[in-house]
């Protein structure tokens, strides 16, 4: 029997047989001239090449198993590689909390001209701060909570005109604060707290600077006048600092030096000129194009082969070979027309050992088995603190989401099965139903339906998002409120019925109706993982050292933060910290803006359809702040929240809008359900 040959090999062999001398000449010609051409015309590295070279610099780069050289980091807006942020190209790198060690070398990433965000927070990198000023298009740099040390050069941030957010907190940096920080024209947020910076604070003149944190350093001298409206807590822990908002300086204190910032002196290189150079470039480009075409043919073949792999390749082979049986609450039939296992709702005692089988909790969906998932075309949707999510399109036409959990080891097998059965009984238009699950001691799979409009977070925070108008945002908030209230009613024995409420755990269907995901999983999660990562444990009441624990009102607090996130378009950065940090709280920022009578600046500038809706937007903002009271007993009950949110309207008529006073309160009976303006800034005044 003739051995099969791939088309690329067959074509080459045929060409060689027909015209061997010509082929040899072409090969020699290309092999000689291509290196010369490439030395003159540099082809930019691909994002994948840059990322792979960067991975090789990491001491524990072996953890990046999804960074496959045979696959692309991005497929449209979906990331195939862990920690990569995509918008048809790689625009961000988010490798947080991975225990990465050693020195951080960012040089391999410099050719990635579309890179806008770099985040390595909560790792164990040490050594000096990496060089970043060659990333001239960078907008955000997050390096907090590592072990970086040493002085940061004064010009470390020169030539970075787009840089808006810099987080260097909780490292061991020393020396003076680099003067180039003061020259960043678009700086919005700067966090230098928890280091060993010395000397005086430079004069920051940026008008849009909203937050600057210098606490717990060794700084001295007067606080620059441009920063004297900041929260006093931003300067705490520096014994030598003085002047507003701290105590006045003594008469002998020197003035604040204005540190001159040298302009960037870009180096320019003159391109080769003349007819000879032009002809050589033309020939080089032609040869490169020919080579690229040949490479593309080979890559297409490799890509087709790589598509056969999928997200379950990391599972032991035995798992893929097991026969999957349906485990449902009603009698059903499997592929062999034999009755599948059926379990009575009221049965107590030990559940039968599923033996590693896929178990269905719904009977209104077409059955599939693990082999269908193994053969499915899978895409990586993302990787969060709970686990990785995959989109799987199986042969029957169903599109599913499979999520792998590695920290669901808080209960035994029987308790886990019982809880999954309980979740399978939930039925509400704003709850994403569980379809099936797979149990192993080491990790679990939860299978749900795929929602076409991605998560709420992607619409609020992705660079390529068109944004959501007011009507859609209000619709989403109303749906989330009803879904959360349903969980409160159906899961009364759970301390926190949801426990992980945030915008990335809310998906949107084709009509932008919201559905809650990752709900009611706290009983299954390991305590350490839950305390470190679940949003409920970032609430102000969670202070185990003081005996304060979470309650059902904690979910109300999370919902309030979500309301503020939807209205402001700002990401709640306290989710990135462990525990509650009022300095990083979105609630604190909103209250500060209200106290300064800048309520109009709170709302997302990207939100459309705001005309004649200001009253309703302010009313929703008040509801959000009521939900976010630091004292639990002052927060609203969930049913009260739903009632108030349901009363909000999409817009006001001209008459209604004209009947409002300048503070945004109605003069009709509707306002009796809401706060008056004296209560609007409650957390600042009480």
UniProtKB/Swiss-Prot annotation:
GO CC entries: plasma membrane
Reported phenotype of the disruption mutant: No effect on pollen germination and growth. Prk2 and prk5 double mutant has no effect on pollen germination and growth. Prk1, prk2 and prk5 triple mutant shows reduced pollen tube elongation.
Chain positions recorded as ATP binding sites: 381-389, 403
Biased composition (Polar residues): 328-339
Keyword Ribosomal protein: no
Keywords assigned: ATP-binding, Cell membrane, Glycoprotein, Kinase, Leucine-rich repeat, Membrane, Nucleotide-binding, Phosphoprotein, Receptor, Repeat, Serine/threonine-protein kinase, Signal, Transferase, Transmembrane, Transmembrane helix
Cytoplasmic side: 305-686
Modified residue annotations for Phosphoserine: 377, 455, 458, 545
One GO MF term attached to the UniProt entry: protein serine/threonine kinase activity
Coiled coil (UniProt feature): none
Function statement: Receptor-like kinase involved in the control of pollen germination and pollen tube polar growth. The extracellular domain serves as a sensor for peptides derived from GRI. May act as a downstream element for ROS-dependent cell death induced by GRI.
Protein name per the record: Pollen receptor-like kinase 5
Organism the protein comes from: Arabidopsis thaliana (Mouse-ear cress)
